[in-house]
Swiss-Prot record:
Membrane-topology annotation of the record: Multi-pass membrane protein
Membrane spanning residue stretches: 62-82, 88-108, 143-163, 185-205, 212-232, 252-272, 292-312, 342-362, 384-404, 407-427, 461-481, 496-516
Database matches in InterPro entries: NCS1, Pur-cyt_permease, Uracil/uridine/allantoin_perm
Cellular-component GO terms for this entry: endoplasmic reticulum; fungal-type vacuole; Golgi membrane; plasma membrane; plasma membrane raft
GO annotation terms (biological process): nucleobase transport; uracil import across plasma membrane
Name listed for the protein in its UniProt record: Uracil permease
Pfam families found in the cross-reference section: Transp_cyt_pur
GO molecular function terms noted in the UniProt entry: nucleobase transmembrane transporter activity; uracil transmembrane transporter activity; uracil:monoatomic cation symporter activity
Family that this chain belongs to: Belongs to the purine-cytosine permease (2.A.39) family.
Main location per the UniProt record: membrane
Alphabetically ordered keywords of this record: Membrane, Phosphoprotein, Transmembrane, Transmembrane helix, Transport
Function (record text): Transport of uracil.
Subcellular location: Membrane
Amino acid sequence: MESVDNNSFFSRIRNSNAYRKVKDFVILDHRPGMTMAERMLTNKDLYPVPPSKRLWGPWNFISFWLADAVNINTWMISATAIELGLNWWEAWICVWVGYLICGILVATTGRPGAVYHISFPVLSRSSFGTWGSLWPILNRSVLACVWYGVQAWIGGECVVLMIRSIWPSFSHIPNTMAKSGTETYQWVGFFIFWLLSNIAIWFPVHQIRHLFTFKAIVAPPAAIAFLIWALVKAHGAGPVIHEPTKLGQYEHAWVVINGIVTCIDGFATLIVNNPDFARFATTPGAVHWPQIITVPLAFGVTSLIGVLVSSASKAIYGTTLWDPTQLLASFLDHSNAHGVRAGVFFIAFGLCIAQLGVNIAANSVSAGNDLSALLPTVINVRRGGYIASIIALCMCPWNLLSSNNNFTTYLSSYSVFLSSFAGVIIADYYFVRKGLIRVAPLYSSSSSSPYYFWKGINFRAFASYICGMLINIVGMAGSTGQKVPKVANTMFNLNYFLGITVACLSHIIICKIFPVTECGEKMLSEVPEEADDYLLTLASEDSIDKDSTSEIYIDGLPTEKEVEKDDVLSITSKKLSGCFP
Protein backbone atom coordinates (compact mmCIF):
# COMPACT_ATOMS: atom_id res chain seq x y z
CA MET A 1 0.00 0.00 0.00
CA GLU A 2 2.91 2.31 0.88
CA SER A 3 4.53 1.55 -2.50
CA VAL A 4 1.32 2.57 -4.30
CA ASP A 5 1.24 5.84 -2.35
CA ASN A 6 4.88 6.54 -3.27
CA ASN A 7 4.19 5.86 -6.94
CA SER A 8 1.18 8.17 -6.78
CA PHE A 9 3.29 10.85 -5.09
CA PHE A 10 6.04 10.74 -7.72
CA SER A 11 3.44 10.61 -10.47
CA ARG A 12 1.87 13.83 -9.19
CA ILE A 13 5.30 15.48 -9.15
CA ARG A 14 6.04 14.41 -12.72
CA ASN A 15 2.67 15.74 -13.88
CA SER A 16 3.00 19.07 -12.10
CA ASN A 17 3.61 22.28 -14.03
CA ALA A 18 6.66 23.10 -11.91
CA TYR A 19 8.32 19.78 -12.77
CA ARG A 20 7.63 20.22 -16.47
CA LYS A 21 9.07 23.74 -16.43
CA VAL A 22 12.22 22.61 -14.64
CA LYS A 23 12.58 19.66 -17.01
CA ASP A 24 12.07 21.84 -20.07
CA PHE A 25 14.71 24.24 -18.78
CA VAL A 26 17.31 21.61 -17.81
CA ILE A 27 16.90 19.17 -20.70
CA LEU A 28 18.02 20.63 -24.00
CA ASP A 29 15.83 20.32 -27.07
CA HIS A 30 16.60 17.43 -29.36
CA ARG A 31 15.32 16.16 -32.65
CA PRO A 32 12.37 13.75 -32.37
CA GLY A 33 12.83 10.01 -32.65
CA MET A 34 16.40 9.97 -31.35
CA THR A 35 17.57 7.19 -29.06
CA MET A 36 19.32 8.05 -25.81
CA ALA A 37 22.64 6.98 -27.34
CA GLU A 38 22.11 9.36 -30.26
CA ARG A 39 21.14 12.16 -27.89
CA MET A 40 24.47 11.61 -26.09
CA LEU A 41 26.24 12.49 -29.33
CA THR A 42 24.30 15.54 -30.47
CA ASN A 43 22.94 18.83 -29.33
CA LYS A 44 22.47 22.22 -30.92
CA ASP A 45 26.11 23.24 -30.46
CA LEU A 46 27.66 20.02 -31.73
CA TYR A 47 26.10 20.14 -35.19
CA PRO A 48 28.22 21.51 -38.06
CA VAL A 49 28.07 25.29 -38.35
CA PRO A 50 25.48 26.34 -40.98
CA PRO A 51 26.47 28.79 -43.73
CA SER A 52 24.86 31.80 -42.04
CA LYS A 53 27.19 31.40 -39.03
CA ARG A 54 30.44 30.97 -41.00
CA LEU A 55 31.53 34.53 -40.44
CA TRP A 56 35.23 34.33 -39.54
CA GLY A 57 37.27 35.60 -42.48
CA PRO A 58 41.07 36.04 -42.70
CA TRP A 59 40.97 39.43 -40.94
CA ASN A 60 38.98 37.96 -38.05
CA PHE A 61 41.69 35.36 -37.48
CA ILE A 62 44.39 38.02 -37.79
CA SER A 63 42.67 40.25 -35.22
CA PHE A 64 42.04 37.19 -33.04
CA TRP A 65 45.75 36.39 -32.80
CA LEU A 66 46.82 40.03 -32.59
CA ALA A 67 44.52 40.30 -29.61
CA ASP A 68 45.44 36.94 -28.10
CA ALA A 69 49.17 37.69 -28.26
CA VAL A 70 48.92 40.58 -25.83
CA ASN A 71 48.66 38.78 -22.51
CA ILE A 72 50.75 38.55 -19.38
CA ASN A 73 52.03 35.02 -20.02
CA THR A 74 53.44 36.01 -23.43
CA TRP A 75 54.85 39.19 -21.89
CA MET A 76 56.91 37.00 -19.51
CA ILE A 77 57.70 34.12 -21.91
CA SER A 78 61.35 35.15 -22.42
CA ALA A 79 62.03 35.47 -18.69
CA THR A 80 62.86 31.81 -18.08
CA ALA A 81 65.34 31.57 -20.96
CA ILE A 82 67.10 34.80 -19.95
CA GLU A 83 67.27 33.76 -16.31
CA LEU A 84 68.73 30.40 -17.39
CA GLY A 85 71.59 32.22 -19.13
CA LEU A 86 70.60 33.29 -22.65
CA ASN A 87 71.04 36.89 -23.70
CA TRP A 88 67.93 38.80 -24.70
CA TRP A 89 68.15 38.37 -28.48
CA GLU A 90 68.80 34.63 -28.22
CA ALA A 91 65.73 34.30 -26.02
CA TRP A 92 63.77 36.38 -28.53
CA ILE A 93 64.83 34.13 -31.43
CA CYS A 94 63.59 31.15 -29.38
CA VAL A 95 60.24 32.91 -29.09
CA TRP A 96 60.03 33.50 -32.85
CA VAL A 97 60.93 29.90 -33.69
CA GLY A 98 58.60 28.50 -31.03
CA TYR A 99 55.60 30.54 -32.11
CA LEU A 100 56.27 29.92 -35.80
CA ILE A 101 55.90 26.22 -35.01
CA CYS A 102 52.75 27.05 -33.04
CA GLY A 103 51.33 28.92 -36.03
CA ILE A 104 51.95 25.96 -38.31
CA LEU A 105 50.39 23.56 -35.80
CA VAL A 106 47.23 25.63 -35.19
CA ALA A 107 46.74 25.96 -38.95
CA THR A 108 47.22 22.20 -39.25
CA THR A 109 44.72 21.28 -36.54
CA GLY A 110 42.31 24.03 -37.58
CA ARG A 111 41.91 22.89 -41.18
CA PRO A 112 39.55 19.94 -40.41
CA GLY A 113 37.31 22.32 -38.49
CA ALA A 114 37.35 24.86 -41.33
CA VAL A 115 36.61 22.22 -44.00
CA TYR A 116 33.85 20.30 -42.20
CA HIS A 117 32.77 23.05 -39.75
CA ILE A 118 32.95 20.73 -36.73
CA SER A 119 34.43 21.32 -33.29
CA PHE A 120 37.28 19.46 -31.61
CA PRO A 121 34.98 17.09 -29.64
CA VAL A 122 33.26 15.96 -32.85
CA LEU A 123 36.51 15.80 -34.83
CA SER A 124 38.11 13.59 -32.17
CA ARG A 125 35.40 10.96 -32.78
CA SER A 126 36.93 10.24 -36.19
CA SER A 127 40.25 9.30 -34.60
CA PHE A 128 39.50 8.05 -31.06
CA GLY A 129 36.08 6.56 -31.79
CA THR A 130 32.49 7.51 -31.08
CA TRP A 131 32.81 6.89 -27.33
CA GLY A 132 36.59 6.78 -27.05
CA SER A 133 36.66 10.50 -27.86
CA LEU A 134 35.28 11.19 -24.39
CA TRP A 135 38.77 10.61 -22.92
CA PRO A 136 40.61 13.43 -24.75
CA ILE A 137 37.53 15.63 -24.29
CA LEU A 138 37.53 15.00 -20.52
CA ASN A 139 41.26 15.68 -20.27
CA ARG A 140 41.02 18.97 -22.07
CA SER A 141 37.89 20.11 -20.23
CA VAL A 142 39.53 19.59 -16.83
CA LEU A 143 42.63 21.49 -17.92
CA ALA A 144 40.52 24.31 -19.39
CA CYS A 145 38.57 24.72 -16.14
CA VAL A 146 41.76 24.91 -14.07
CA TRP A 147 43.47 27.34 -16.44
CA TYR A 148 40.30 29.46 -16.49
CA GLY A 149 40.70 30.05 -12.76
CA VAL A 150 44.43 30.78 -13.02
CA GLN A 151 43.99 33.28 -15.86
CA ALA A 152 41.03 34.89 -14.09
CA TRP A 153 43.17 35.46 -11.00
CA ILE A 154 45.84 37.14 -13.15
CA GLY A 155 43.11 39.26 -14.75
CA GLY A 156 41.95 40.20 -11.27
CA GLU A 157 45.37 41.71 -10.59
CA CYS A 158 44.76 44.09 -13.51
CA VAL A 159 41.41 45.07 -12.00
CA VAL A 160 43.13 45.77 -8.67
CA LEU A 161 45.52 48.15 -10.44
CA MET A 162 42.61 49.98 -12.06
CA ILE A 163 40.85 50.40 -8.71
CA ARG A 164 44.08 51.50 -6.98
CA SER A 165 44.53 54.13 -9.69
CA ILE A 166 41.19 55.65 -8.66
CA TRP A 167 41.29 54.92 -4.91
CA PRO A 168 44.94 54.55 -3.79
CA SER A 169 43.86 53.30 -0.36
CA PHE A 170 42.08 50.29 -1.87
CA SER A 171 45.04 47.96 -1.23
CA HIS A 172 44.98 48.91 2.46
CA ILE A 173 41.42 47.84 3.26
CA PRO A 174 41.15 45.42 6.22
CA ASN A 175 41.96 41.84 5.29
CA THR A 176 39.01 39.66 6.27
CA MET A 177 40.23 36.67 4.25
CA ALA A 178 43.59 35.93 5.86
CA LYS A 179 42.61 32.32 6.60
CA SER A 180 41.82 31.82 2.91
CA GLY A 181 45.39 32.59 1.89
CA THR A 182 44.68 35.87 0.11
CA GLU A 183 44.01 39.55 0.69
CA THR A 184 40.51 40.98 0.56
CA TYR A 185 41.43 43.58 -2.08
CA GLN A 186 42.95 40.87 -4.30
CA TRP A 187 39.84 38.72 -4.02
CA VAL A 188 37.61 41.68 -4.88
CA GLY A 189 39.64 42.31 -8.04
CA PHE A 190 39.40 38.64 -8.98
CA PHE A 191 35.65 38.56 -8.38
CA ILE A 192 35.05 41.64 -10.53
CA PHE A 193 37.06 40.11 -13.37
CA TRP A 194 35.15 36.85 -12.90
CA LEU A 195 31.84 38.71 -13.23
CA LEU A 196 33.00 40.49 -16.39
CA SER A 197 34.03 37.16 -17.89
CA ASN A 198 30.54 35.79 -17.28
CA ILE A 199 29.11 38.52 -19.50
CA ALA A 200 31.41 37.48 -22.36
CA ILE A 201 30.46 33.81 -21.93
CA TRP A 202 26.83 34.62 -22.74
CA PHE A 203 27.56 35.43 -26.38
CA PRO A 204 27.98 32.67 -28.99
CA VAL A 205 31.35 32.05 -30.60
CA HIS A 206 30.44 33.49 -33.98
CA GLN A 207 29.64 36.80 -32.23
CA ILE A 208 32.56 37.08 -29.80
CA ARG A 209 34.85 37.79 -32.75
CA HIS A 210 33.87 41.40 -31.95
CA LEU A 211 35.50 41.01 -28.52
CA PHE A 212 38.76 40.02 -30.16
CA THR A 213 38.49 42.93 -32.59
CA PHE A 214 37.99 45.29 -29.63
CA LYS A 215 40.91 43.69 -27.81
CA ALA A 216 43.09 44.09 -30.92
CA ILE A 217 42.27 47.82 -30.86
CA VAL A 218 42.80 48.35 -27.12
CA ALA A 219 45.51 45.94 -25.93
CA PRO A 220 48.41 46.57 -28.38
CA PRO A 221 48.34 50.39 -27.92
CA ALA A 222 48.34 49.84 -24.15
CA ALA A 223 51.42 47.61 -24.44
CA ILE A 224 53.21 50.14 -26.66
CA ALA A 225 52.34 52.99 -24.27
CA PHE A 226 53.71 50.92 -21.38
CA LEU A 227 56.95 50.36 -23.34
CA ILE A 228 57.42 54.06 -24.11
CA TRP A 229 56.67 55.04 -20.52
CA ALA A 230 59.14 52.52 -19.09
CA LEU A 231 61.92 53.48 -21.53
CA VAL A 232 61.47 57.20 -20.79
CA LYS A 233 61.39 56.56 -17.06
CA ALA A 234 64.57 54.42 -17.26
CA HIS A 235 66.33 56.82 -19.69
CA GLY A 236 66.96 53.90 -22.01
CA ALA A 237 66.41 50.18 -22.42
CA GLY A 238 68.11 49.18 -19.18
CA PRO A 239 70.94 46.71 -18.43
CA VAL A 240 69.26 43.39 -19.28
CA ILE A 241 69.69 43.83 -23.04
CA HIS A 242 73.44 44.34 -22.54
CA GLU A 243 73.98 41.16 -20.53
CA PRO A 244 75.97 38.45 -22.39
CA THR A 245 75.28 34.74 -22.63
CA LYS A 246 76.30 32.95 -19.43
CA LEU A 247 76.32 29.35 -20.69
CA GLY A 248 78.75 26.83 -22.12
CA GLN A 249 78.16 25.36 -25.57
CA TYR A 250 76.40 22.16 -24.39
CA GLU A 251 74.16 23.91 -21.86
CA HIS A 252 73.53 26.69 -24.35
CA ALA A 253 72.01 24.33 -26.91
CA TRP A 254 69.62 22.74 -24.42
CA VAL A 255 68.48 26.06 -22.99
CA VAL A 256 67.71 27.24 -26.55
CA ILE A 257 65.65 24.09 -27.14
CA ASN A 258 63.92 24.57 -23.79
CA GLY A 259 63.08 28.16 -24.72
CA ILE A 260 61.46 27.02 -27.98
CA VAL A 261 59.51 24.19 -26.36
CA THR A 262 58.31 26.47 -23.55
CA CYS A 263 56.47 28.58 -26.13
CA ILE A 264 54.84 25.50 -27.65
CA ASP A 265 53.88 24.08 -24.24
CA GLY A 266 52.00 27.27 -23.45
CA PHE A 267 50.17 26.94 -26.76
CA ALA A 268 49.22 23.27 -26.29
CA THR A 269 45.57 23.95 -25.49
CA LEU A 270 45.10 26.36 -28.39
CA ILE A 271 46.71 23.88 -30.80
CA VAL A 272 44.18 21.22 -29.85
CA ASN A 273 41.10 23.42 -29.65
CA ASN A 274 41.66 25.47 -32.82
CA PRO A 275 38.83 23.61 -34.64
CA ASP A 276 36.43 25.20 -32.13
CA PHE A 277 37.12 28.55 -33.85
CA ALA A 278 38.13 27.35 -37.30
CA ARG A 279 34.68 25.78 -37.75
CA PHE A 280 33.32 29.31 -38.17
CA ALA A 281 35.72 30.12 -41.03
CA THR A 282 34.29 31.44 -44.28
CA THR A 283 36.72 29.24 -46.23
CA PRO A 284 39.44 26.72 -45.28
CA GLY A 285 42.06 29.17 -46.55
CA ALA A 286 41.07 31.67 -43.86
CA VAL A 287 42.84 29.55 -41.22
CA HIS A 288 46.13 29.02 -43.07
CA TRP A 289 48.43 31.99 -43.71
CA PRO A 290 46.58 34.39 -41.39
CA GLN A 291 47.52 32.10 -38.50
CA ILE A 292 50.94 30.95 -39.72
CA ILE A 293 52.13 34.55 -40.18
CA THR A 294 50.24 36.37 -37.43
CA VAL A 295 51.03 34.01 -34.54
CA PRO A 296 54.86 34.37 -34.56
CA LEU A 297 54.69 38.04 -35.52
CA ALA A 298 52.21 39.07 -32.81
CA PHE A 299 53.63 36.91 -30.03
CA GLY A 300 57.21 37.80 -30.97
CA VAL A 301 56.51 41.54 -30.73
CA THR A 302 54.68 41.13 -27.40
CA SER A 303 57.57 39.17 -25.89
CA LEU A 304 60.04 41.82 -27.13
CA ILE A 305 58.01 44.53 -25.41
CA GLY A 306 58.07 42.40 -22.26
CA VAL A 307 61.87 42.06 -22.39
CA LEU A 308 62.44 45.79 -22.96
CA VAL A 309 59.99 46.88 -20.25
CA SER A 310 61.46 44.40 -17.75
CA SER A 311 64.98 45.56 -18.61
CA ALA A 312 63.89 49.14 -17.98
CA SER A 313 62.45 48.09 -14.62
CA LYS A 314 65.93 47.02 -13.48
CA ALA A 315 67.28 50.46 -14.31
CA ILE A 316 64.40 52.09 -12.43
CA TYR A 317 64.18 49.95 -9.30
CA GLY A 318 67.36 47.87 -9.29
CA THR A 319 65.57 44.56 -9.82
CA THR A 320 64.08 42.94 -12.91
CA LEU A 321 60.28 42.84 -12.71
CA TRP A 322 59.09 40.42 -15.38
CA ASP A 323 55.44 40.59 -14.34
CA PRO A 324 53.95 43.79 -15.81
CA THR A 325 51.37 44.03 -13.02
CA GLN A 326 54.18 44.17 -10.45
CA LEU A 327 55.89 46.98 -12.34
CA LEU A 328 52.64 48.96 -12.62
CA ALA A 329 52.05 48.41 -8.90
CA SER A 330 55.55 49.77 -8.24
CA PHE A 331 54.67 52.88 -10.24
CA LEU A 332 51.71 53.45 -7.91
CA ASP A 333 53.76 52.65 -4.80
CA HIS A 334 56.36 55.29 -5.67
CA SER A 335 54.09 58.06 -6.95
CA ASN A 336 50.61 59.36 -6.24
CA ALA A 337 50.62 61.85 -9.12
CA HIS A 338 47.44 62.08 -11.19
CA GLY A 339 49.33 61.46 -14.43
CA VAL A 340 50.89 58.26 -13.08
CA ARG A 341 47.55 57.01 -11.81
CA ALA A 342 45.84 57.78 -15.13
CA GLY A 343 48.60 56.03 -17.07
CA VAL A 344 48.44 52.94 -14.86
CA PHE A 345 44.65 52.85 -15.18
CA PHE A 346 44.59 52.84 -18.97
CA ILE A 347 47.46 50.35 -19.31
CA ALA A 348 45.86 48.06 -16.71
CA PHE A 349 42.56 48.37 -18.59
CA GLY A 350 44.28 47.20 -21.78
CA LEU A 351 45.90 44.27 -19.96
CA CYS A 352 42.54 43.42 -18.36
CA ILE A 353 40.84 43.23 -21.76
CA ALA A 354 43.81 41.17 -22.97
CA GLN A 355 43.37 38.66 -20.14
CA LEU A 356 39.62 38.54 -20.71
CA GLY A 357 40.10 37.71 -24.38
CA VAL A 358 42.71 35.03 -23.82
CA ASN A 359 40.64 33.41 -21.07
CA ILE A 360 37.55 33.25 -23.27
CA ALA A 361 39.50 31.98 -26.29
CA ALA A 362 41.76 29.42 -24.64
CA ASN A 363 39.59 28.25 -21.76
CA SER A 364 35.92 29.25 -21.75
CA VAL A 365 35.10 28.26 -25.33
CA SER A 366 37.09 25.03 -25.16
CA ALA A 367 35.57 24.07 -21.79
CA GLY A 368 32.10 24.87 -23.13
CA ASN A 369 32.56 22.70 -26.21
CA ASP A 370 34.07 19.86 -24.21
CA LEU A 371 31.48 19.81 -21.43
CA SER A 372 28.76 20.04 -24.06
CA ALA A 373 30.16 16.89 -25.70
CA LEU A 374 30.45 15.07 -22.37
CA LEU A 375 26.79 15.61 -21.44
CA PRO A 376 25.01 16.99 -24.51
CA THR A 377 21.49 16.34 -23.20
CA VAL A 378 21.78 19.09 -20.57
CA ILE A 379 24.93 21.12 -21.37
CA ASN A 380 25.45 23.42 -24.33
CA VAL A 381 28.47 25.65 -24.98
CA ARG A 382 27.06 28.52 -22.94
CA ARG A 383 26.19 26.34 -19.95
CA GLY A 384 29.56 24.63 -20.22
CA GLY A 385 31.29 28.00 -20.10
CA TYR A 386 29.39 28.95 -16.96
CA ILE A 387 30.15 25.59 -15.34
CA ALA A 388 33.85 26.19 -16.01
CA SER A 389 33.48 29.67 -14.52
CA ILE A 390 31.88 28.30 -11.33
CA ILE A 391 34.56 25.61 -11.01
CA ALA A 392 37.23 28.30 -11.41
CA LEU A 393 35.69 30.31 -8.58
CA CYS A 394 35.36 27.30 -6.27
CA MET A 395 38.91 25.99 -6.73
CA CYS A 396 40.49 29.09 -5.09
CA PRO A 397 43.14 29.79 -7.75
CA TRP A 398 45.16 32.02 -5.41
CA ASN A 399 46.17 28.89 -3.50
CA LEU A 400 47.30 27.18 -6.71
CA LEU A 401 49.53 30.15 -7.56
CA SER A 402 51.15 30.41 -4.14
CA SER A 403 54.94 30.39 -4.15
CA ASN A 404 55.18 27.10 -2.24
CA ASN A 405 52.84 25.26 -4.59
CA ASN A 406 54.11 23.17 -7.53
CA PHE A 407 50.70 23.17 -9.18
CA THR A 408 51.68 25.59 -11.95
CA THR A 409 54.54 23.24 -12.81
CA TYR A 410 52.05 20.38 -13.14
CA LEU A 411 49.87 22.56 -15.37
CA SER A 412 52.76 23.40 -17.68
CA SER A 413 53.88 19.78 -17.80
CA TYR A 414 50.38 18.66 -18.76
CA SER A 415 51.20 19.59 -22.34
CA VAL A 416 52.73 16.11 -22.72
CA PHE A 417 49.19 14.69 -22.74
CA LEU A 418 47.84 17.30 -25.14
CA SER A 419 50.79 16.79 -27.50
CA SER A 420 49.88 13.11 -27.80
CA PHE A 421 46.25 13.96 -28.57
CA ALA A 422 47.38 16.43 -31.24
CA GLY A 423 49.75 13.86 -32.75
CA VAL A 424 47.00 11.27 -33.10
CA ILE A 425 44.48 13.71 -34.60
CA ILE A 426 46.99 15.12 -37.12
CA ALA A 427 48.16 11.65 -38.17
CA ASP A 428 44.61 10.35 -38.49
CA TYR A 429 43.31 13.27 -40.55
CA TYR A 430 46.25 13.91 -42.87
CA PHE A 431 48.08 10.60 -43.22
CA VAL A 432 45.53 7.87 -42.45
CA ARG A 433 42.23 9.27 -43.77
CA LYS A 434 43.94 11.80 -46.08
CA GLY A 435 41.36 14.43 -45.22
CA LEU A 436 38.24 12.35 -45.86
CA ILE A 437 35.63 12.55 -43.09
CA ARG A 438 32.02 11.41 -43.31
CA VAL A 439 30.12 13.90 -41.20
CA ALA A 440 26.82 12.05 -40.63
CA PRO A 441 28.43 8.96 -38.99
CA LEU A 442 30.16 11.25 -36.47
CA TYR A 443 26.72 11.75 -34.90
CA SER A 444 25.65 8.10 -35.12
CA SER A 445 25.81 5.50 -32.35
CA SER A 446 25.34 2.65 -34.83
CA SER A 447 27.94 -0.11 -34.82
CA SER A 448 28.00 0.20 -38.62
CA SER A 449 29.52 3.68 -38.36
CA PRO A 450 33.12 3.81 -39.65
CA TYR A 451 34.01 5.61 -36.42
CA TYR A 452 32.48 3.06 -34.07
CA PHE A 453 35.48 0.68 -34.26
CA TRP A 454 35.31 -1.72 -31.25
CA LYS A 455 32.41 -0.72 -28.97
CA GLY A 456 32.96 2.90 -29.94
CA ILE A 457 36.69 2.89 -29.10
CA ASN A 458 39.59 3.01 -31.55
CA PHE A 459 42.38 0.98 -29.91
CA ARG A 460 44.83 2.24 -32.57
CA ALA A 461 44.45 5.84 -31.40
CA PHE A 462 44.75 4.94 -27.73
CA ALA A 463 47.85 2.81 -28.33
CA SER A 464 49.43 5.73 -30.20
CA TYR A 465 48.40 8.18 -27.48
CA ILE A 466 49.96 6.01 -24.79
CA CYS A 467 53.21 5.73 -26.78
CA GLY A 468 53.42 9.51 -27.10
CA MET A 469 52.64 10.00 -23.42
CA LEU A 470 54.97 7.35 -21.97
CA ILE A 471 58.09 8.74 -23.62
CA ASN A 472 57.63 11.91 -21.54
CA ILE A 473 56.09 10.63 -18.33
CA VAL A 474 59.38 10.08 -16.43
CA GLY A 475 60.69 13.50 -17.42
CA MET A 476 57.39 15.03 -16.34
CA ALA A 477 57.89 13.55 -12.88
CA GLY A 478 61.38 15.04 -12.83
CA SER A 479 60.04 18.49 -13.70
CA THR A 480 57.93 18.43 -10.53
CA GLY A 481 60.93 17.72 -8.30
CA GLN A 482 61.01 13.92 -8.26
CA LYS A 483 64.33 12.09 -8.58
CA VAL A 484 64.61 10.60 -12.06
CA PRO A 485 67.51 9.63 -14.36
CA LYS A 486 69.36 12.60 -15.84
CA VAL A 487 68.59 11.44 -19.38
CA ALA A 488 64.86 11.71 -18.62
CA ASN A 489 65.25 15.34 -17.58
CA THR A 490 67.27 16.03 -20.72
CA MET A 491 64.66 14.38 -22.93
CA PHE A 492 61.92 16.39 -21.26
CA ASN A 493 63.42 19.53 -22.80
CA LEU A 494 61.94 18.12 -26.02
CA ASN A 495 58.65 17.10 -24.38
CA TYR A 496 56.16 18.51 -26.90
CA PHE A 497 58.23 17.46 -29.91
CA LEU A 498 58.63 13.94 -28.55
CA GLY A 499 54.97 13.57 -27.63
CA ILE A 500 53.48 14.77 -30.91
CA THR A 501 56.09 12.99 -33.08
CA VAL A 502 55.92 9.62 -31.34
CA ALA A 503 52.10 9.65 -31.21
CA CYS A 504 51.88 10.69 -34.88
CA LEU A 505 54.33 8.06 -36.16
CA SER A 506 52.85 5.35 -33.93
CA HIS A 507 49.36 6.01 -35.27
CA ILE A 508 50.51 5.90 -38.89
CA ILE A 509 52.34 2.60 -38.33
CA ILE A 510 49.53 0.96 -36.35
CA CYS A 511 46.95 1.98 -38.96
CA LYS A 512 49.16 0.44 -41.65
CA ILE A 513 49.09 -2.85 -39.74
CA PHE A 514 45.41 -2.57 -38.76
CA PRO A 515 43.78 -0.47 -41.53
CA VAL A 516 40.68 1.63 -40.95
CA THR A 517 37.81 2.20 -43.37
CA GLU A 518 36.64 5.40 -45.11
CA CYS A 519 40.04 6.75 -46.15
CA GLY A 520 40.87 9.04 -49.05
CA GLU A 521 42.87 7.82 -52.02
CA LYS A 522 45.32 10.73 -52.02
CA MET A 523 46.41 13.52 -49.68
CA LEU A 524 43.62 15.98 -48.80
CA SER A 525 40.79 14.01 -50.38
CA GLU A 526 38.42 16.33 -48.55
CA VAL A 527 34.71 16.58 -49.26
CA PRO A 528 33.59 19.96 -47.82
CA GLU A 529 30.02 19.28 -48.98
CA GLU A 530 29.71 16.62 -46.25
CA ALA A 531 28.72 19.23 -43.65
CA ASP A 532 26.17 20.90 -45.92
CA ASP A 533 24.72 17.55 -46.98
CA TYR A 534 24.25 16.57 -43.35
CA LEU A 535 22.61 19.89 -42.48
CA LEU A 536 20.34 19.58 -45.51
CA THR A 537 19.33 16.08 -44.41
CA LEU A 538 18.47 17.34 -40.92
CA ALA A 539 16.45 20.23 -42.33
CA SER A 540 14.58 17.89 -44.69
CA GLU A 541 13.71 15.50 -41.87
CA ASP A 542 12.48 18.37 -39.71
CA SER A 543 10.28 19.68 -42.51
CA ILE A 544 8.75 16.23 -42.97
CA ASP A 545 7.89 16.04 -39.26
CA LYS A 546 5.14 18.68 -39.17
CA ASP A 547 4.69 18.45 -35.40
CA SER A 548 8.37 18.82 -34.68
CA THR A 549 9.60 21.92 -32.93
CA SER A 550 13.16 20.78 -33.41
CA GLU A 551 15.54 23.21 -35.02
CA ILE A 552 19.24 23.30 -35.65
CA TYR A 553 20.81 25.45 -32.98
CA ILE A 554 24.25 26.95 -32.84
CA ASP A 555 26.08 28.17 -29.73
CA GLY A 556 23.12 27.85 -27.42
CA LEU A 557 20.94 30.36 -29.28
CA PRO A 558 18.08 29.10 -31.49
CA THR A 559 18.32 30.46 -34.98
CA GLU A 560 15.26 32.17 -36.35
CA LYS A 561 13.18 30.11 -38.74
CA GLU A 562 13.89 32.62 -41.49
CA VAL A 563 17.63 32.21 -40.95
CA GLU A 564 17.29 28.44 -40.94
CA LYS A 565 15.35 28.66 -44.16
CA ASP A 566 18.10 30.81 -45.67
CA ASP A 567 20.67 28.22 -44.59
CA VAL A 568 18.78 25.43 -46.31
CA LEU A 569 18.24 27.53 -49.43
CA SER A 570 21.91 28.50 -49.56
CA ILE A 571 22.91 24.86 -49.32
CA THR A 572 20.34 23.84 -51.91
CA SER A 573 21.32 26.53 -54.37
CA LYS A 574 24.95 25.56 -53.96
CA LYS A 575 24.11 21.97 -54.79
CA LEU A 576 21.84 22.89 -57.72
CA SER A 577 24.17 25.44 -59.24
CA GLY A 578 26.35 22.69 -60.64
CA CYS A 579 23.37 21.10 -62.44
CA PHE A 580 22.69 23.96 -64.83
CA PRO A 581 24.80 25.10 -67.77
